[in-house]
Amino acid sequence: DHLDFGEPEHKNSIIKVIGVGGGGGNAVNNMYKQGIHDVSFVVCNTDAQVLRDSPVPERLQLGSEGLGAGNKPEKGRLAAEESLDDIKAMLSDGTKMDFITAGMGGGTGTGAAPVIARVSKEMGILTVGIVTIPFKWEGNKKIDQALDGVDEMSKHVDALLVINNDRLRKVYTDLSVINAFAKADDTLSIAAKSISEIITVRGLINLDFNDVRTVLKDGGVAIMSTGFG
């Protein structure tokens, strides 16, 4: 099964979770390892080495260089634009809803996630963004880049969950730097996992897919734990 490179695990799954860049990719790697059913996973990155290291079978290299985006969102955006046909092909397998998850602030997630969201929405897929905003100590430049990315993302999704890492840190006060990053990835995983499981675990909460569509369609921006207080 795992040797079947490039094939989604569940060929007929209508829900796809897409990790873009480092943070989003880590979140999707974690979810994949947890073995969530009825959902297919894809990791997208400009860094070919990071993709090779992912356990997820379906991987999409953005752009032709394979060297990462060096914290430059414009580079991430151009790489995604270069790979538009691949992005469309990845979404053309009967996907009806997707969760596009990314850490905002770096190059690939910030630049490429909004492009993938745009393609998804143009294809009529119910598109949900789940993104994190950096920690304050990561610096103003990164936070400004992240907020620009969130703004761009919000134009191309039906719903957007924004997870503020500083708020996260106040909740988990004993976190070291490394743990804080892991926890942010974990929160991305939990958010995507809980929404997808609400839809797919029949009998637990029998929420009809059309109900979800009605709730989320062009529902604007839903922000979890906002502000830099």
Model-derived regions, located:
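Tubulin/FtsZ superfamily GTPase core signature
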Residues: D1-G229
